[in-house]
From Swiss-Prot:
Major localisation: cytoplasm
Enzyme class name: transferase
Gene Ontology cellular-component annotations: cytoplasm
Family stated for the protein in its record: Belongs to the KdsA family.
Pfam families given in the database record: DAHP_synth_1
GO molecular function ontology, one term from the record: 3-deoxy-8-phosphooctulonate synthase activity
Name of protein: 2-dehydro-3-deoxyphosphooctonate aldolase
Gene3D superfamilies cross-referenced by the UniProt entry: Aldolase class I
Domain of life: Bacteria
The keyword Lipoprotein is assigned to this record: no
Length: 285
């Protein structure tokens, strides 16, 4: 699959989707994007900057949601223009899809909306690559159906069917907890879509703090290493210079100062994993 000018897949180097959870200010976006650009350039790692203009699924109605669509897209356009970076943002309504597709390079659909056929189909018809997040309530093999819906919508619109990624972000494990089953990555790969692992939302503790979600950011490196060893096309991580003061998802964000060390490990591990291939693919032979 071609994505933002580079190839993605199990025979290609690991790519990164990263940035603050939500747009807090234009300066923060520029600072974080600039630092990530420098780190990934040194590592030879393809990079897509991400951030959200509206967090429509916050735990509390009083929580900060973002600057709104118009202002948020304006800031993302600035990052794209001034730093020459591809950008990704998530969309929550069909109106968002049309507006965001005019500005960003990649769209992302929320995990909670992965079963909404009309929404997934609308995203698939926008002409942009789409990172489709697996719902916390979905078995990994059910993502094949979601990818098939997107491909069918693209086909009916006369567009390429090779523009969709499947993103794992953990599965509900009782109340206020998620678990990551690394088998899901291999199962989702069978859809033929590149698989991305969301290492930060996978350590979220949804709603565990009453009016907001908690998280175990110290476990991000653990799950990220495991996912890259299992074999993925890309890794998704939210990061912030000061996670304890972040306006959204701080408890599961990677401190920006640790991103280089973590990415160095992941790039090295990805090279070993992909160089030796995937023995599991031959077990049925």
């Amino acid at each position: 699959m071609k994505l933002c000018g580079f190839d993605v897949g199990l025979e290609q180097r690991l790519f990164l989707i990263a940035g603050p959870c939500v747009i807090e200010s234009a300066q923060l976006q520029m600072d974080v994007a600039g630092q990530l650009r420098e780190i990934t350039a040194r590592l030879g790692m393809p990079f897509i900057f991400k951030s959200s203009f509206d967090k429509a699924n916050r735990s509390s109605g009083s929580s900060y949601r973002g600057p709104g669509r118009d202002k948020g897209l304006e800031i993302l356009a600035r990052v794209r223009r001034e730093l020459a970076l591809p950008v990704l943002t998530d969309v929550h309504t069909e109106d968002d899809i049309a507006a965001a597709a005019q500005v960003v390079d990649v769209l992302q659909t929320p995990a909670f909306l992965c079963r909404q056929t009309d929404f997934i189909s609308a995203a698939a018809r926008c002409g942009k690559p789409v990172n489709i997040k697996k719902g916390q309530f979905l078995a990994p093999h059910e993502m094949h159906n979601v990818i098939d819906k997107a491909r069918a919508a693209a086909r009916q619109a006369g567009l390429s069917e090779d523009r969709f990624m499947a993103c794992e972000r953990g599965a509900s494990f009782g109340y206020n907890n998620l678990v990551s089953d690394m088998r899901s990555l291999a199962i989702m790969r069978a859809s033929g879509a590149p698989v991305v692992f969301d290492a930060t939302h996978s350590v979220q503790l949804p709603g565990s703090q009453g009016s907001r979600s908690g998280g175990q950011r110290e476990m991000v490196p653990v799950l990220a290493r495991a996912a890259v060893a299992a074999g993925v096309a890309g890794i998704f991580m939210e990061t912030h210079p000061d996670p304890d003061r972040a306006l959204s998802d701080g408890p599961n964000a990677v401190p920006l100062k640790h991103m280089q060390a973590l990415l160095e490990t992941l790039v090295a591990l990805d090279g070993v994993t992909k160089r030796h291939g995937f023995l599991e693919n031959r077990f049925g032979a």
